[in-house]
A protein has these predicted regions:
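Conserved ATP/PPi-binding loop(s) of AMP-dependent carboxylate-activating enzymes
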Residues: 74-78, 89-121, 159
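Core-facing hydrophobic residues within beta-strands of well-ordered domains
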Residues: 16-19, 76-78, 174, 221
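Alpha-helix capping/helix-boundary segments
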Residues: 1-2, 29, 107
Length: 247
């Protein structure tokens, strides 16, 4: 949404001096988009986090922040968040990825008439397992790494689409992009990169050269595809599954 608005031809005709707060959520805000938004409006994006199961929100950055942090902020009052591993143990090492788990008054009681599905996502001590992988810094701020199910396993190495997209979004000539995992005979999975051009003259060779200089080898895309638009939900979240499923 922020990217689409900031790139709209009429965006610069608006006087943004009275814009006080811009709150981002729904999907991770890319640093390149946050910078573009700040440059054009003078108002930093304040990113928050929540899911349907934790409506409307579980964490947020301070609205008084003067710059984009790249984090989802701190848990809201009365809310507890932690990181857990695949066995349900708490991850306490700073910077170590784990699944974000949330406990608070906004967390659902369960899925309607689906006790089996509820049991899969609720821990014994009442935390909801979000399916999002995150890290926590020394201040207690959380940062989303990616959806657990979207992780790409390349020759045994974990590749998170968000980290690839964050880099490629800064490539000159790129409007927006998405990275997904596709089956590969040699590496098990490989990175597929789908790009919407800002510069119509952008070439695959330029994208690959940029990736070679900014991404480690196993994170570089095996396939680069250009499209006029990316499939999205009504609220603007990229539908990665449609990019994976399309042959």
């Amino acid at each position: 949404l922020f990217n689409g608005l900031a790139n709209h031809p009429d965006f610069n005709t608006v006087n943004w001096k009275n814009l006080k707060v811009a709150v981002g959520g729904g999907m991770a805000v890319q640093g390149a988009v946050a910078k573009l938004w700040l440059d054009k409006t003078g108002c930093p994006i304040c990113e928050g986090y929540g899911l349907s199961e934790t409506s409307p929100s579980a964490s947020c950055n301070p609205v008084t922040a003067t710059e984009f942090t790249g984090t989802i902020g701190l848990p809201l009052p009365g809310t507890s968040m932690k990181l857990i591993d695949d066995e349900g143990n708490e991850v306490t090492e700073l910077g170590q990825p784990g699944e974000i788990a949330i406990k608070g008054p906004q967390v659902m009681a369960g899925y309607w008439q689906r006790p089996d599905e509820t049991a899969k996502v609720m821990t014994a001590d009442g935390y909801f397992k979000t399916g999002d992988v995150g890290v926590m810094d020394e201040r207690g701020f959380f940062k989303i790494v990616d959806r657990k199910k979207d992780m790409i396993l390349v020759s045994g190495f974990n590749v998170y689409p968000n980290e690839v997209e964050e880099v490629v979004a800064n490539c000159p000539g790129v409007m927006e992009c998405a990275a997904v995992g596709v089956l590969d005979d040699k590496s098990g999975e490989a990175v597929k990169l789908v790009i919407v051009k800002k510069d119509p003259d952008l070439t695959e060779a330029q994208v690959r050269d940029y990736c070679r200089h900014n991404l480690t080898g196993y994170k570089q895309p095996k396939t680069v595809e250009f499209r006029t638009e990316l499939p999205k939900t009504p609220v603007g979240k990229i539908l990665r599954r449609e990019l994976r499923d399309k042959k």
